Design a protein with these regions (language model features):
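Glycogenin-like
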Residues: 84-131
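Conserved nucleotidyltransferase catalytic core and NTase-mimicking acidic/glycine-rich helix/loop elements
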Residues: 116-249
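Acidic, carboxylate-rich catalytic segments that either coordinate divalent cations
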Residues: 245-270
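Alpha-helix initiation/capping motif
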Residues: 49-50, 96-99, 114-115, 157, ...
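Metal-dependent nucleotidyltransferase catalytic core
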Residues: 1-20, 24-37, 43-104
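Short acidic (Asp/Glu) patches
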Residues: 74-77, 88, 107-109, 145-152
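Generic structural signal for hydrophobic core residues of well-folded globular domains
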Residues: 95, 168-175, 264, 268
């Protein structure tokens, strides 16, 4: 796959007449929770020619593709290899607003294409991102996911409980260390283990073992000990009242992102 996915991405570049800035893996493989049944979730950022950007023709800001195990193109949903790409303008807008999806892409530890571009951007983000705002984004996303999952009790599974915990760990990591979390849930859990009740760590490790053995989508009843811990954690986060700290933090240097885009697109024309 380390060779095949970059080959597929090069074909995407040719078919859509785009240039991929960087491409990464997201999800369970980057969390180090993948099993033999895990699919591949590939995300990429692309840009077009200057001519395309100043054309009256409308080009899509997002490209979604799917491939089966034989690398035949199929619909994206449920595919063995799911690909989703954002145009650089869309992606940089999300990045500048501290969107956690955009942050997770730049923070991925599995890179298929454009490692130099990705690492340069990651260094910039680490030094310029509004850490309290990132914390709030992870916190609110975790709370929203937990509420949504509990609302669909007949669809509760191991993976969903781990997803909420992964977001909580990301928020806790930013709060404690004032920097971006690891993309690996395992590493974040190890770093924060002393901050978390022993019974919660044990339960999460139990779910991690289930996920890695291929039981991530197994339907489960409500796990009361985790639900209680999640709700209490959300209340603790809410009581931090970080709105003032968010305002006090410097805004991201948008000029850097603008120049980064301009350099790529204009250079491509020369």
């Amino acid at each position: 796959m380390e060779q095949k996915i970059p080959e597929l991405l090069k074909t995407v570049e040719q078919n859509f007449k785009i240039k991929i800035l960087f491409a990464v893996e997201v999800g369970s493989r980057t969390w180090e929770l993948n099993s033999t049944e895990s699919d591949y979730d590939v995300r990429f950022v692309f840009y077009r020619s200057l001519e395309d950007y100043i054309s009256v023709s409308k080009f899509e800001e997002q490209i979604d593709l799917g491939f089966d195990k034989d690398f035949n193109q199929i619909q994206r949903e449920g595919a063995y290899i799911e690909m989703s790409g954002f145009d650089i303008f869309k992606y940089f807008k999300l990045l500048s607003s501290c969107n956690v999806t955009a942050i997770d892409w730049i923070n991925s530890n599995i890179i298929y294409l454009g490692d130099n571009n990705k690492n340069e951007l990651k260094t910039f983000i680490e030094n310029n991102v509004n850490k309290p705002k990132i914390f709030i984004q992870y916190f609110c996303t975790a709370r929203g996911c937990h509420k949504g999952y509990l609302g669909a009790k007949n669809e509760l599974n191991v993976k969903k409980y781990l997803h909420v915990m992964q977001l909580i760990l990301n928020a806790e990591y930013v709060l404690k260390f004032k920097k971006l979390p690891y993309s690996s849930m395992i590493k974040n859990l190890q770093e924060l283990e002393k901050e978390i009740p022993k019974e919660i760590v044990e339960k999460i490790n139990e779910l991690i073992n289930m996920k890695k053995s291929g039981h991530g989508k197994d339907i489960t009843n409500e796990i009361n000990v985790l639900d209680k811990y999640y709700v209490e954690t959300f209340e603790r986060f809410q009581n931090l009242h970080l709105d003032k700290k968010i305002r006090e933090e410097k805004n991201m240097d948008i000029n850097y992102l603008n120049k980064f885009m301009q350099k790529l697109i204009i250079k491509k024309e020369k």
